């Protein structure tokens, strides 16, 4: 089991992400020479990010990951993380911050007890950086594109589909987790 580093209350991001009954929020992050850093912080939600322009260094639980255009990042809940601009070129990313309760993390079913709760408790370690050479990359890109389209268009029932694409994303990442349970 991976033990995350100690969380300092002062580093907690105190922002409400989404609505009470639909706790997900989209963010576009832009880093420039004038504003090259997102400072170290943590929150109770997970993050799913696509780098849309440039390159950066993500620090997740004090481990550095170099990320560039097209890369996908997954940050589990309750992990310290920051972003630093890697070069003088501008950087942009699209991020969905979501609470695991959106996916059923607060229910007592097999998905919650076997997968979601262990993710939150860091008993399952999923890959944080997914690059083009990762076996799940193409599938994750398709899921991300569908998630983004649904979030923006908000057609009737979009909440159901967003939930399903987030669950699909976690399923794909679970295939490459460092701890697996037998079924």
Which role fits each region the language model picked out?
Residues 36-42, 84-86, 106-108, 160:
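Short histidine-centered beta-strand/loop micro-motifs
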Residues 131-182:
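An amphipathic alpha-helical interaction segment
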Residues 2-25, 84-148:
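A hydrophobic/aromatic-rich effector-binding and dimerization subdomain
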Residues 53, 77, 98-100:
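Residues immediately flanking
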Residues 61-62, 71, 85-87, 108, ...:
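Short, solvent-exposed loop/turn segments at secondary-structure boundaries
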Residues 1-68, 72, 79, 113-114, ...:
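Generic protein-terminus/edge-of-domain signal
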């Amino acid at each position: 089991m991976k033990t995350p580093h100690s969380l300092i209350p002062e580093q907690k991001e105190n922002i409400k992400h989404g609505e009470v009954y639909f706790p997900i929020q989209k963010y576009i992050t832009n880093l420039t020479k004038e504003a090259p850093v997102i400072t170290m912080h943590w929150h109770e939600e997970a993050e799913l990010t696509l780098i849309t322009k440039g390159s950066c260094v993500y620090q997740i639980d004090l481990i550095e990951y170099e990320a560039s255009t097209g890369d996908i990042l997954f940050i589990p809940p309750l992990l310290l993380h920051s972003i630093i601009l890697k070069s003088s070129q501008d950087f942009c990313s699209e991020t969905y911050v979501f609470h695991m309760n959106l996916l059923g993390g607060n229910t007592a079913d097999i998905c919650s007890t076997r997968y979601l709760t262990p993710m939150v408790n860091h008993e399952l370690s999923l890959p944080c950086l997914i690059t083009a050479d990762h076996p799940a990359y193409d599938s994750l890109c398709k899921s991300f594109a569908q998630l983004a389209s649904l979030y923006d268009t908000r057609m009737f029932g979009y909440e159901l589909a967003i939930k399903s694409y987030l669950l699909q994303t976690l399923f794909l990442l679970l295939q490459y987790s460092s701890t697996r349970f037998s079924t």
